[in-house]
């Protein structure tokens, strides 16, 4: 067998393993969702419900969301922001987990969701209606550089902004945009590793941001899954597949606090 053929087989096996893991994560999360009636049982978003078959994004993360541990570092930080920040703005809202959960928790008074996918916006509306927060949530399409013009000034200056837009953060958050958001607390999921010049893009973002904000970082850390009776009959591998958020590498978020 030639080296090229051997390498091809190895790569096919790796892709096959990745596919099998993803498929298993989705199956486990789907099963757990059914058992938990598609309802968050733990954490600050407790009692938030997902409409059946409304998940179009990251379905393998359902279990972590319902257990209140998905992106726990971000979730905990959001819940600790000062109460004067009563507006939540979600860029890359997906199916509304944060947009709706923050309203269900009553941590925020009003929300603004930006989601590029029509299917995503449909899911957000469906889930907002199910959770009876439809009147508190405004839903928009793709977030552009001037997305903040859609937000009343009195809400914008008291806002917390969560940004998860798969690399577009580097094109949207230029110095002018950051200047207009200087009164907000901003959390940015970083995707610099999507780009060959990602380090350069990240350094520029930080350089622009430091004119208006104090910059800190959050990183994915540990989870304790022994506390959930729903997982007591899962084997060790299954529990840790529920814990997995299916990421390509250790995730980092920037937190920007007004100076």
Predicted regions and their residues:
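Residues at the C-termini of beta-strands that transition into short coil/loop
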Residues: 143, 190, 213, 219-222
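Short alpha-helix
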Residues: 199-212
């Amino acid at each position: 067998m030639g080296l090229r053929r051997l390498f091809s087989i190895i790569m096919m096996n790796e892709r096959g393993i990745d596919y099998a893991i993803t498929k298993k994560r989705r199956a486990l999360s789907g099963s757990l969702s059914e058992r938990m009636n598609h309802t968050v049982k733990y954490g600050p978003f407790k009692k938030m419900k997902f409409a059946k078959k409304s998940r179009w994004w990251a379905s393998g993360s359902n279990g972590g969301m319902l257990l209140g541990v998905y992106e726990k570092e971000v979730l905990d930080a959001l819940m600790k922001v000062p109460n004067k920040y009563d507006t939540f703005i979600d860029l890359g809202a997906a199916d509304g987990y944060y947009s709706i959960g923050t309203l269900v928790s009553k941590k925020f008074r009003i929300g603004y969701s930006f989601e590029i996918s029509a299917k995503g916006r449909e899911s957000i509306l469906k889930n907002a209606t199910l959770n009876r927060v439809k009147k508190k949530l405004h839903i928009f399409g793709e977030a552009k550089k001037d997305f903040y013009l859609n937000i009343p000034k009195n809400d914008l200056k008291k806002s917390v902004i969560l940004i998860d837009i798969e690399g577009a953060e580097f094109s949207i958050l230029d110095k002018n945009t950051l200047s207009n958001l200087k009164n907000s607390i901003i959390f940015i999921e970083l995707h610099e590793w999507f780009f060959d010049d990602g380090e350069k893009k990240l350094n520029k973002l930080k350089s622009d941001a430091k004119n208006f904000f104090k910059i800190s970082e959050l990183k994915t850390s540990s989870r304790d899954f022994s506390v959930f009776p729903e997982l007591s009959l899962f084997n060790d591998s299954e529990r840790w597949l529920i814990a997995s958020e299916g990421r390509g590498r250790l995730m980092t978020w920037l937190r920007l606090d007004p100076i």
